[in-house]
């Protein structure tokens, strides 16, 4: 299936381009209190090494805002401030931050929005209109309830507000906690504007539930060419958010990066400790950013066939096995030696590609 992405306007968050032909960026949000400068920077650095492109932080009051200024000066990643209720915090943070997210449901009057727009325009930073089904403006929830219709009305109303103020550095999110409603919201808004979309399922839950919901919603939208930046929301799992997001991009065929591991589900034919092997391989290869297909198979039934399509593969047998690279057997070893040799071949494959580039 040919992937064709919806062409959107391009904006910039720090040094990261969003929309247009730019790669789809991956975001996360800290769960520290922003006034905890050391703790916040520690989480930002973890996200940086995990492969995040952009980080968002909550700002509840001026103590957070002042801390955010110091955090921004030391951050390796662009930062977005997440504002609810108090528009003055957005105005203050616009002086040094890379982007502002406002919630139309609680930011207040048109005058409040006008002040935020003025501050962001002066700095040349974008605003995300973050529509959330749980906090729709009363004028729309009274008329439409808390469903997709109300979200669409809110989005279009706030887009027009910003456009009437001659502001167009906009991105939009349409988040619900339900995968189907999230898909519907983004699909229905897409023909109505050409601003970049930030994809996400809000309040998606813990690792298991979030992975399922986000894979369904975000994967579905990405395959339809919808989405310019994304977050996999996950309760308390910073690095996993990035890992799952990158996996969704890779397995949907939208953006190749990192290791794609092919491994069998195991059955009665297995005569080796495949589960231990795959855990080691997964842990030892998670740092790799180069697109790489590797195969770890437990018996000969499908192992050789899978190996033909893999860059590096293991085919386990009884107490021994094969290490295969680009379809060619490079070693036949006893089981205790297989994983180490396999990982050495993986690292050599990565290095050889770097030399060619």
From Swiss-Prot:
Gene3D superfamilies: Dihydropteroate synthase-like, Sulfite Reductase Hemoprotein, domain 1. Binds 1 [4Fe-4S] cluster. InterPro entries: Dihydropteroate_synth-like_sf, IspG_bac, IspG_bac-typ, NO2/SO3_Rdtase_4Fe4S_sf. Keywords: 4Fe-4S, Iron, Iron-sulfur, Isoprene biosynthesis, Metal-binding, Oxidoreductase. Its cofactor is [4Fe-4S] cluster. Its EC number is 1.17.7.3. GO terms for biological process: isopentenyl diphosphate biosynthetic process, methylerythritol 4-phosphate pathway; terpenoid biosynthetic process. It catalyses: (2E)-4-hydroxy-3-methylbut-2-enyl diphosphate + oxidized [flavodoxin] + H2O + 2 H(+) = 2-C-methyl-D-erythritol 2,4-cyclic diphosphate + reduced [flavodoxin]. It holds the Pfam family GcpE. Pathway: Isoprenoid biosynthesis; isopentenyl diphosphate biosynthesis via DXP pathway; isopentenyl diphosphate from 1-deoxy-D-xylulose 5-phosphate: step 5/6. [4Fe-4S] cluster binds at residues 264, 267, 299, 306. It is an enzyme of class 1 (oxidoreductase). One of its GO terms (molecular function) is 4-hydroxy-3-methylbut-2-en-1-yl diphosphate synthase activity (ferredoxin). Belongs to the IspG family. Converts 2C-methyl-D-erythritol 2,4-cyclodiphosphate (ME-2,4cPP) into 1-hydroxy-2-methyl-2-(E)-butenyl 4-diphosphate. PANTHER family: 4-HYDROXY-3-METHYLBUT-2-EN-1-YL DIPHOSPHATE SYNTHASE (PTHR30454), 4-HYDROXY-3-METHYLBUT-2-EN-1-YL DIPHOSPHATE SYNTHASE (FERREDOXIN), CHLOROPLASTIC (PTHR30454:SF0). HAMAP family: IspG. This is 4-hydroxy-3-methylbut-2-en-1-yl diphosphate synthase (flavodoxin). The gene is ispG.
